[in-house]
């Protein structure tokens, strides 16, 4: 039907949003439910939440959306859910969770995971990847559970991604899109199937029968069950479509489909993603993720603590702005962003390495602020954090360009940080590339809607769907002089400092761990 809508749930770290999109990319209706407590911590650096917490919020926001306009809600021809990554669920034989989710930001480690085979350890050492593999091995939730909750692990019938579990709650089928399975699990990202004998299979030694069914992106997972219909208000039998992860959907939603484009996501974590038909590892042993289009990939570099760092800064250094924002009815970030123009490019020599949490491929990195003098203010720190995040993303983008032979000529921004004109302009100046925003900040949900309408047959290809559903709202042109300055800082200082200080960070970590 020509007036059909796509119902999309965007399940985030902080909230769930429900949206109805038309085939022109317009949001016809939307509703949001913000979590009062996104997660709880039983120990420092732990983060957990009930799996059904997210389904319950889907139910709340779905009913809220239906109440806005039952007529529009009834026009939904499909439903799709896109979810944050690297969060898994232990399901019992009855389909119920056996424990709460260990969320993606959780930093616990297995102390004595199952030893890796000697021949594999030798190969990892030969490739110079011992520390990265050890970090992957120890930080995998499955290995922590197997070590610390062995009886529960034995009882686990299925070990699935959160997205898979939500599919199950809606349809009764334990299946997921090949573009949603981004977690520490034995997945062959290149071939979109479970890895049975690959080199890194031993790192996540999960029995094959504990894993879910894999579907091509755009497939029908199943019809909404009568029970899910009762709880959500979604008509029973409405087809649920397999789409992709939040970052993968966001990249498509930002219209990044060509090999001269890159998507920058300025969310809780920051990423730079390409879309490419050729598979290549963005860094050694780190896979390119399957893209929402089934014949494409999304190589990515991620800064785990991305725009979360602005929250960290706000909590520790910007109480005055927080109080002022309450009085003005705006966010503290809006007030802080107005001061960005008061600080020159390069933050008067203050430089940030934004690795408050080390990445999987860089286990010895740590965060740092260098270059302090007595005239620096908190506003210098704020701008330096934004610049530091961009330097790290630039470093990741340049590395992927070298490994792929691609040349990026245009950037597309999504995530909360992209709402700021000042941040967008700084980004254009630093990368020396035009930076564009699309018609909506809901690029993740839009990407899931694009996948939905391709699956429903409204469009013959993703390129066709993007042409009809995505519009450029504004573009920021780089300032050539500022780019020259940033390029010098990156090449002459940032890269050299990063390489020089990483061994010291490793030593410092070893010393302080021993002291504990």
What are these regions (language model features)?
Residues 189-294, 327-338, 410, 418-428:
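ATP-dependent carbohydrate kinase catalytic cores
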Residues 4-10, 73-81, 159, 239-253, ...:
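Short glycine-aspartate micro-motif
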Residues 52-54, 118-133, 233-234, 260-263, ...:
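A polyampholytic, Gly/Pro-enriched intrinsically disordered region
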Residues 32-74:
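N-terminal phosphate-binding loop and adjacent alpha-helix
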Residues 11-13, 24, 91, 125-245, ...:
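Gly/Ser/Thr-rich active-site cleft segment
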Residues 58-77, 148-153, 196-208, 230-232, ...:
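Phosphate/pyrophosphate-binding loops at sites that engage ATP/ADP/AMP, CoA/4′-phosphopantetheine
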Residues 138-145, 170, 186, 250-254, ...:
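Buried hydrophobic packing segments
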